Structures are given as structure tokens and as C-alpha cells.
UniProtKB/Swiss-Prot annotation:
Gene it is expressed from: MT-ND3
Species, as recorded: Oncorhynchus tshawytscha
Family stated for the protein in its record: Belongs to the complex I subunit 3 family.
The protein, known as: NADH-ubiquinone oxidoreductase chain 3
Catalysed conversion reaction: a ubiquinone + NADH + 5 H(+)(in) = a ubiquinol + NAD(+) + 4 H(+)(out)
Its biological purpose: Core subunit of the mitochondrial membrane respiratory chain NADH dehydrogenase (Complex I) that is believed to belong to the minimal assembly required for catalysis. Complex I functions in the transfer of electrons from NADH to the respiratory chain. The immediate electron acceptor for the enzyme is believed to be ubiquinone.
UniProt-recorded Gene Ontology molecular function terms: NADH dehydrogenase (ubiquinone) activity
């Protein structure tokens, strides 16, 4: 128990010291070089402060949603080894139906249209 306490104390102390140094170390007044964007040693082609399209974020969130669906359904073949494989089938069908209804809703609302 004493070893765990020592390791936790060292970890917290080291983290606090490094966090404090990271706030004190940089200069207070930033110059133009630090505020300019850097693109592999070349001058930037356009403004680096242009906002992204909201449609991009919507497509990205939908991709993550369906990627998570696949991650949840990958262990499904091992579900038939449970005591009640029909319950596993019912739950997986419910998840697929819910996500399919969500996709149909996004499609009908025009959320998947990239150009307006």
C-alpha cells in the first residue's frame, strides 16, 4: 500500500510541476511569427481562420454514429452462445431499426445534401 501511495504522490507532484512550468515558460507577449499559420515551411495559400461548413460536422457526426453501430454489432455472432439468443437478436434488430429510422429522418430533412 505504501508503494502505491508513493507512486500516486510522485505522479500528482510531477503533473502539477509540469503544468505550472508550461504556463510560466512561454513568453507573455506573442509576436507575429507565433500568430501566423505554418504550412510545411511554405507561405499559407489562404486564410487559416476560415470557418468549416456546418454540413461537414453533420456528416462527420453521422459517420461516427454509424461507425459506432458497426462496433456494437461486431460481437453479434458470439451472441448466439448466450442463454437467450433470441433476446440478442431482438436487441440488435431494435438498434438497427432505430439507426435506420434516424438515417431516413436525416435523409428526408436534407441533412445529407452537401450542396444547398
Amino acid at each position: 500500500m505504501n508503494l502505491i501511495t508513493t507512486i500516486i504522490t510522485i505522479t500528482i507532484t510531477l503533473s502539477a510541476v509540469l503544468a505550472t512550468i508550461s504556463f510560466w515558460l512561454p513568453q507573455i507577449s506573442p509576436d507575429a511569427e507565433k500568430l501566423s499559420p505554418y504550412e510545411c515551411g511554405f507561405d499559407p495559400l489562404g486564410s487559416a481562420r476560415l470557418p468549416f461548413s456546418l454540413r461537414f460536422f453533420l456528416i462527420a457526426i453521422l459517420f461516427l454514429l454509424f461507425d459506432l453501430e458497426i462496433a456494437l454489432l461486431l460481437p453479434l455472432p458470439w451472441g448466439d452462445q448466450l442463454d437467450t439468443p433470441t433476446l440478442t437478436l431482438i436487441w440488435s434488430t431494435a438498434v438497427l431499426a432505430l439507426l435506420t429510422l434516424g438515417l431516413i429522418y436525416e435523409w428526408t430533412q436534407g441533412g445529407l445534401e452537401w450542396a444547398e
